Swiss-Prot record:
Assembly with partners or alone: Homodimer and heterodimer. Able to interact with SPRED2 to form heterodimers. Interacts (via C-terminus) with TAOK1/MARKK (via C-terminus); the interaction does not affect TAOK1 kinase activity. Interacts (via C-terminus) with TESK1 (via C-terminus); the interaction inhibits TESK1 kinase activity. Interacts with CAV1. Interacts with RAS. Interacts with palmitoyltransferase ZDHHC17/HIP14; the interaction leads to palmitoylation of SPRED1.
Listed name of the protein: Sprouty-related, EVH1 domain-containing protein 1
A GO molecular function held by the record: phosphatase binding
Biased composition (Acidic residues): 135-147
Domain KBD span(s) in chain numbering: 233-285
Clinical disorder: Legius syndrome: An autosomal dominant syndrome characterized mainly by cafe-au-lait macules without neurofibromas or other tumor manifestations of neurofibromatosis type 1, axillary freckling, and macrocephaly. Additional clinical manifestations include Noonan-like facial dysmorphism, lipomas, learning disabilities, and features of attention deficit-hyperactivity disorder.
Physiological role: Tyrosine kinase substrate that inhibits growth-factor-mediated activation of MAP kinase. Negatively regulates hematopoiesis of bone marrow. Inhibits fibroblast growth factor (FGF)-induced retinal lens fiber differentiation, probably by inhibiting FGF-mediated phosphorylation of ERK1/2. Attenuates actin stress fiber formation via inhibition of TESK1-mediated phosphorylation of cofilin. Inhibits TGFB-induced epithelial-to-mesenchymal transition in lens epithelial cells.
Post-translational modification: Palmitoylated by ZDHHC17/HIP14.
One Gene Ontology cellular component: caveola
Region (Disordered): 123-151
Domain SPR: 334-442
UniProt source species: Homo sapiens
Modified residues (N-acetylserine): S2
Membrane topology: Peripheral membrane protein
């Protein structure tokens, strides 16, 4: 691969986790570390094409941390088969190649799964199906622009007395409305001296200026009907105070996109508050702040300074101080286990499913559920080593009855397995009451 692929940019990365890269050994029917054991930095990223047509290639790259050796490098495709066997082990299949990752925590596994899903969505929506379709769409757009520009020119230059010397200009690249209007205004002023009138005794200069103003008003009307770019008379855009600017973490945005689907009500109040804040103008006189003014003439009155659009911005090189947290809904932090935001006032036991739960672990060991999982892995797993949860009540599974019969038979050999169901029900009641389960832990 090229150096650009090897050193992917942070803006083009979808996920970056630490895991052990595994490969499938068909001879033994198990998974072995790829390229030797060791923790690797695995990244899902894209490499845009240089043609700038919106297409890109998506890769999964694994680099071992101890010696910087590339142990995994594969390109993502639409026909990817992704399996989540356990919370800390996922594997996928591309063509005839099988790879897997053993993660350090379930949060890393979910972050990698979200990155894979986003990459597959971008692969499905990113590029057109064929090059001929893209060229056909460009030709159709160019023909529409040619027809519209020819109608404007015929309407504007239908006077026979005007002698034009304007060079030919291709209509494939369409200028902006303001640039086109300014260019034609200069053209009108330059052509005013070439207009001749048959009646002597009239002021040629005044007639020329009237003609120019009339053509400019017609051109403004045509631009309004075609482009429909409304402009406000005066618009003031100002920024908040330095202490009220909130620093945005790109990782928070990356994780928040998929968290919104699982917890849509969590961000509803924040979005409504952001919309309300966007309509409020903050104005604070400060001599240290630098403002830049950009004026753009109005469509109907080009020479009027009152109808100019004024944008006030601050230089981007200004250092931003630490943000002040909002106190309306309590202090919110991000959990280090599930990467979700939580409120400290509502953080009780049972809120985080990925946090360490010693009671649940004790129930798992006392009831000897490891024996049940071992039996299902060796007797009822598929070719990829996947098997259903031992106590799953999903009747759509084709081995539902056989699995429960095997568990009942195994319970006669290991009687302590019968304690799992009542203990697990008591544990769930404790989670509902806030007495059992894991709690969120703030990052940092």
């Amino acid at each position: 691969m090229s150096e650009e692929t090897a050193t992917s940019d942070n803006d083009n990365s979808y996920a970056r986790v630490r895991a052990v890269v595994m490969t499938r050994d068909d001879s033994s029917g198990g998974w072995l570390p790829l390229g030797g054991s060791g923790l690797s930095s695995v990244t899902v990223f894209k490499v845009p094409h240089q043609e700038e047509n919106g297409c890109a290639d998506f890769f999964i790259r694994g680099e071992r941390l101890r010696d910087k050796m590339v142990v995994l490098e594969c390109m993502l495709k639409k026909d990817l088969i992704y399996n989540k066997v356990t919370p800390t082990f996922h594997h996928w299949k591309i063509d005839d190649k099988k790879f897997g990752l053993t993660f350090q925590s379930p949060a890393d596994a979910r972050a990698f799964d979200r990155g894979i899903r986003r990459a597959i969505e971008d692969i499905s929506q990113g590029c057109p199906e064929s090059k001929n379709e893209a060229e056909g769409a460009d030709d159709l757009q160019a023909n529409e622009e040619d027809s519209s520009s020819s109608l404007v020119k015929d309407h504007l230059f239908q006077q026979e007395t005007v002698v034009t010397s304007e060079p030919y200009r291709s209509s494939n690249i369409r200028p902006s409305p303001f640039e086109d209007l300014n260019a034609r205004r200069v053209y009108m002023q330059s052509q005013a001296n070439q207009i001749t009138f048959g009646q002597p005794g009239l002021d040629i200069q005044s007639r020329s200026m009237e003609y120019v103003q009339r053509q400019i008003s017609k051109e403004c009307g045509s631009l309004k009907s075609q482009n429909r770019v409304p402009l406000k008379s005066i618009r003031h855009v100002s920024f908040q105070d330095e202490d009220e600017i909130v620093r945005i973490n790109p990782r928070d945005i990356l994780i928040r996109r998929y968290a919104d689907y699982r917890h849509p009500d969590m961000w509803k109040n924040d979005l409504e508050r952001d919309d309300a804040d966007s309509s409020i103008q903050f104005s604070k006189p400060d001599s240290k702040k630098s403002d830049y003014l950009y004026s753009c003439g109005d469509e109907t009155k080009l020479s009027s300074p009152k109808d100019s659009v004024v944008f006030k911005t601050q230089p981007s090189s200004l250092k931003i101080k630490k943000s002040k947290r909002r106190k309306e809904d309590g202090e919110r932090s991000r959990c280090v286990y599930c990467q979700e935001r939580f409120n400290h006032e509502e953080n009780v036991r049972g809120k985080c499913q990925d946090a360490p739960d010693p009671i649940k672990r004790c129930i798992y060991q006392v009831s000897c559920m490891l024996c049940a999982e071992s039996m299902l892995y060796h007797c009822m797993s598929d070719s990829e080593g996947d098997f259903s949860d031992p106590c799953s009540c999903d009747t759509s599974d084709d081995k539902f009855c056989l699995r429960w019969l095997a568990l009942v038979a195994l319970s006669f050999i290991v009687p302590c397995m019968c304690c799992y169901v009542p203990l697990r029900m008591c544990h769930r009641c404790g989670e509902a009451c806030g007495c059992c389960g894991g709690k969120h832990k703030a990052a940092g």
